[in-house]
């Protein structure tokens, strides 16, 4: 069991899209490493989910804009007392590399959209039970290829998405690092905080799993509300009336 459980809440749709993509990338990488063909099907489905999610908005452009904004903030720290300049310059060089790789790409996943077999498989997997050997024998044959062949194919299909993954990961890492973790007590299971006009992009909440609660979060540019509830799998979540200790971080970078 995890020592703490982390919950994140986005303040805008751009960060919500980032978190969804991060989740899909994590799922894709996890199942692509496995050897079982049935688990590789989850990896392939995650690949198609990534394509769907990236088609809904200009994720590439948004990530590039965020990285440029974060780069300018880091440049402003040059010669600043207390800042490790060698580490700062290394970060800026790494950021330039990531930005260049992402900017050099065309439309995210375009090569995958032009792969006729993957397009056909994408359509079959969208149908419940549609990828059986009856409906798509070529996919059944692929699933029965050696593990090394399937893994190589998955890595090949992943490759066009790696610049986006690296850019997205860097943007989210810098955003998360901008927050300061604080100990909070939710009296009678509830907590609210005024934001005093400061613009935040992400709220992070850490909860001890032994408490048996989870946060239900809502927020706008003026205030954050957190209400802790329990869930036993049988009925809808029930709000708790006891005090709950947790940690919170507001991220604005």
Swiss-Prot record:
Keywords: Cell cycle, Cell division, Cytoplasm, Septation
Primary site of residence: cytoplasm
Gene Ontology CC terms, in alphabetical order: cell division site; cytoplasm
Localization terms from the record: Cytoplasm
Family annotation (SUPFAM superfamilies): YacF-like (SSF160950)
Keyword set includes Cell cycle: yes
InterPro entries: ZapD (IPR009777), ZapD_C (IPR027462), ZapD_sf (IPR036268)
Function: Cell division factor that enhances FtsZ-ring assembly. Directly interacts with FtsZ and promotes bundling of FtsZ protofilaments, with a reduction in FtsZ GTPase activity.
Self-association state and partner proteins as the record states: Interacts with FtsZ.
Family affiliation: Belongs to the ZapD family.
Protein name, UniProt field: Cell division protein ZapD
Protein source organism: Bordetella pertussis (strain Tohama I / ATCC BAA-589 / NCTC 13251)
Encoding gene per record: zapD
């Amino acid at each position: 069991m995890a020592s703490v459980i982390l919950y994140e809440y986005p303040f805008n749709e751009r960060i919500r899209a980032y978190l969804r993509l991060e989740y899909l990338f994590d799922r894709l990488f996890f199942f692509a490493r496995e050897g079982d063909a049935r688990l590789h099907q989850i990896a392939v489905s995650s690949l198609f989910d990534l394509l769907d999610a990236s088609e809904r908005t200009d994720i590439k452009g948004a990530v590039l804009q965020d990285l440029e904004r974060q780069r300018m903030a880091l440049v402003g720290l040059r010669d600043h007392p207390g800042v490790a300049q060698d580490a700062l310059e290394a970060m800026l060089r790494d950021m330039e590399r990531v930005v260049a790789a992402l900017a050099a790409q065309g439309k995210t996943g375009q090569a995958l959209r032009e792969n006729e077999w993957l397009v056909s498989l994408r359509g079959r997997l969208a149908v419940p039970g549609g990828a059986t050997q009856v409906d798509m024998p070529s996919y059944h044959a692929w699933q029965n290829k050696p593990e090394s062949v399937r893994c190589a194919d998955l890595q090949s299909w992943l490759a066009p998405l790696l610049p986006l993954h690296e850019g997205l990961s860097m943007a989210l890492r810098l955003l998360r690092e901008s927050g300061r973790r604080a100990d909070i007590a939710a009296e009678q299971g509830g907590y609210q905080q005024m934001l005093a006009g400061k613009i935040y992009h992400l709220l992070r909440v850490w909860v001890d799993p032994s408490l048996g609660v989870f946060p239900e979060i809502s927020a706008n540019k003026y205030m954050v509300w957190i209400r802790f509830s329990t869930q036993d799998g049988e009925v809808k979540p029930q709000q708790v009336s006891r005090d709950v200790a947790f940690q919170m971080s507001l991220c604005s970078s």
